[in-house]
UniProtKB/Swiss-Prot annotation:
Belongs to the chloride channel CLIC family. The modification Phosphoserine is found at residues 39, 348, 393. Monomer (soluble state). Interacts with dopamine receptors DRD2, DRD3 and DRD4. In the soluble state, catalyzes glutaredoxin-like thiol disulfide exchange reactions with reduced glutathione as electron donor. Can insert into membranes and form voltage-dependent chloride-selective channels. The channel opens upon membrane depolarization at positive voltages and closes at negative membrane voltages. May play a critical role in water-secreting cells, possibly through the regulation of chloride ion transport. PANTHER family: CHLORIDE INTRACELLULAR CHANNEL PROTEIN 6, CHLORIDE INTRACELLULAR CHANNEL PROTEIN 6-RELATED. The gene is CLIC6. This is Chloride intracellular channel protein 6. It is found in: Cytoplasm; Cell membrane. Its main location: cytoplasm. The lineage of its organism: Eukaryota, Metazoa, Chordata, Craniata, Vertebrata.
Length: 637
């Protein structure tokens, strides 16, 4: 961070213990941190006292009959010293208005205590020169305030209505004029020092809507447009005058409220230094200070002091792009926004430009806020995919479109999925449809009362669809195929009617086979079961009409399809596969019966089903199936 010399008359930075009047003397031999430019600006001042004395002398020389402004120069203890160097404690800079002698008058809130305001009100040059001279003489003769260990500089008076606390903020309700005075409507926080030794020419005034946090010092040698607050972590070297929307652009509130500057939060320290560094190219620190003092003394500067006056001077003007960039970097705080609502509108060109900048920022924030809310609403959505009016959402909406709950038989532990081919049948259909649904297992041993009231006298499976209770399995299948239809949901009906009847007698043959307890009759029941299985196997190995190419000379001997009606699962598979799986598990467990290896169609069919999530994730555990038939598959005698 670049460091610049503090102009004379500024409050000392808060480092080192107070040393009384010994610190009023210049420190010989200390290096000038501001470089050649600061030394050149200081050399232009009468009596060699620096930019602050030069500005004061230029403003009061004609009025006081050639007085060389040495009163301001005698009280500059830190001329040429480094910002933040070894200076008295910040408490030495506390000048309490209520504790000052009678010769020093602290202006009340809303009063103008600066030369810039007086120029606007008085107008004639004679009143300007006389008032500046009286102010300088009166403040030079006044003794230091009690408790203050450093005298107030006449060219740089600090009029504080409250107290000047170390660690607070500078709320400049008044204006900073050529005399360098700061009218603090609230309190001044000398965290470092606010150095106004040179003249701060605002054409209007410097209105800090936020706070001036001077961690180092503010060397006003150039033009700084304070669209909001000035946060000088090190030192801000402004080559011209501090240009802001002053009283000419819009009147202050009755209570000395700061004027609307479009931003209230402090500007980031690094950004403030970058802006000051960009503005400081090609200008010496005291260059515009002397020009400002000379123009005010000659009565040539306009009191309106916004960008119009500064823009006509090539040295003092600043491109509009820099002003817009600085305004964009400042974000208004909640306190500033509340103050802006109470202040009258700014009618000056700069005020209108600042208002447009302020208006653009909330619109962008509101737009982003609305976009964020709309994005959140789209992401969350209704839980069941339905709008407030109860209508189903649009096609393709990933949300839940219907409120569906499937009640299935619970296992012997009362929680897991139990053995029930009809429950698995509906489970597979809902899964294949791709609809969002809930599954509730029902323990038949202790059926809850609410379920008894929901479907009295009905055992699982049953279903609720958007509040309607469905209990018949075959009708539920038809209802789901009709309600959850394409294009939103896949069609599960078969293309070939023969697929619906294939294997329809297998489960009945199996039930007779597993319930038989007579060894003599076992062979009969087993042959009956094998006959039904061979019929099913033959259908699975027989090519479907769409598998046969009418233009091919080769006959397809064996089908290669995965399921009953083709390579996709259908309603026929949802009915047959759960039963075929139960036959495979129970016959092996209790009758040591397996599907013959030569039944390649059945084995291909089962293996393809075991590779599908819709089947294996709806199947009960093998132990559940075996446990369910433990009482049925009695030992043969």
């Amino acid at each position: 961070m670049a460091e610049t010399a503090e102009p004379e008359g500024g409050a000392p930075s808060p480092q080192g213990p107070p040393e009384g009047s010994a610190l009023l003397e210049e420190r010989p031999g200390e290096p000038d941190p501001a470089g050649p430019e600061a030394s050149e600006g200081a050399a232009k001042a009468p009596s060699g006292e620096g930019a602050g004395a030069a500005a004061k002398a230029g403003a009061t020389e004609e009025a006081s009959g050639g007085r060389d402004g040495e009163g301001a120069g005698e009280q500059a203890p830190d001329a040429g010293t480094e910002s933040g160097g070894e200076t008295p404690d910040a408490k030495g800079a506390q000048i309490e208005a209520e504790g000052a002698p009678e010769g020093t008058k602290a202006p009340q809130l809303g009063e103008e205590g600066s030369g810039g305001k007086q120029v606007e009100e008085s107008g004639p040059d004679c009143e300007l020169r006389g008032e500046a001279a009286r102010e300088a003489e009166g403040q030079a003769a006044a003794p230091a305030a009690p408790g203050a260990q450093e005298e107030a500089v006449p060219g740089d008076s600090v009029d504080a209505e409250g107290s000047i606390d170390a660690g607070g903020s500078v709320d400049a309700a008044g204006s900073v004029d050529a005399g360098g005075s700061i009218d603090a409507g609230g309190s001044m926080d000398a965290g470092g020092s606010v150095d106004a030794g040179g003249s701060i020419d605002t054409g209007g005034s410097v209105d800090a809507a936020g706070s001036v946090d001077a961690g180092g010092s503010i060397d006003t040698g150039r033009n700084v447009d304070a669209g909001g607050s000035i946060d000088a972590g090190g030192s801000v070297d402004a080559g011209g005058s501090m240009d802001a929307e002053g009283p000419a652009g819009g009147a202050h509130g009755a209570g000395g409220e700061p004027q609307d500057l479009g931003a209230g939060s402090p500007q980031p320290r690094s950004e403030a230094v970058e802006v000051a560094a960009a503005e400081n190219e090609g200008h010496s620190p005291g260059e515009s200070v002397e020009d400002a003092a000379a123009e005010e003394a000659a009565g040539t500067r306009e009191p309106e002091g916004s960008e119009d006056a500064a823009g006509e001077d090539g040295d003092q003007g600043r491109p509009q792009e820099e002003t817009e960039q600085q305004a964009e970097r400042q974000e208004p705080g909640p306190e500033t926004q509340s103050e802006e609502e109470e202040r009258p509108p700014d009618r000056s060109p700069d005020g209108e430009a600042a208002a447009s900048t302020r208006a653009a920022q909330p619109e962008a924030e509101l737009s982003n806020h609305l976009a964020a809310e709309e994005g959140g609403q789209r992401g969350e959505g209704p839980a069941n995919g339905r709008g407030e009016d109860g209508e189903a959402s649009e096609e393709g909406d990933p949300g839940q479109e219907h409120d569906i709950t499937l009640f299935v038989k619970a296992g012997y532990d009362g929680e897991s999925i139990g053995n029930c081919p009809f429950s698995q049948r509906l489970f597979m259909i809902l899964w294949l449809k791709g609809v969002i649904f809930n599954v509730t297992t029902v323990d038949l041993k202790r059926k809850p009362a609410d379920l008894q009231n929901l479907a009295p006298g009905t055992n699982p499976p049953f279903m609720t669809f958007d509040g309607d209770v469905k209990t018949d399995v075959n009708k539920i299948e038809e209802f789901l195929e009709e309600k959850l239809a394409p294009p939103r949901y896949p069609k599960l009906a078969t293309q070939h009617p023969e697929s619906n009847s294939a294997g329809n007698d297998v489960f009945a043959k199996f039930s007779a086979f597993i319930k038989n307890t007579k060894k003599d009759a076992n062979e009969i029941y087993e042959k009956s079961l094998l006959k039904a299985l061979k019929k099913l196997d033959a259908y699975l190995n027989s090519p479907l009409p769409d598998e046969v190419d009418a233009y091919s000379t080769e006959d397809v001997a064996v089908s290669g399809r995965k399921f009953l009606d083709g390579d996709d699962l259908t309603l026929a598979d949802c009915n047959l596969l759960p039963k075929l799986h139960i036959i495979k598990i129970v016959a092996k467990k209790y009758r040591d019966f397996e599907f013959p290896p030569e039944m390649t169609g059945i084995w291909r069919y089962l293996n393809n089903a075991y590779a599908r999530d819709e089947f294996i994730n709806t199947c009960p555990a093998d132990q559940e199936i075996e446990h369910a038939y433990s009482d049925v598959a009695k030992r043969m005698k």
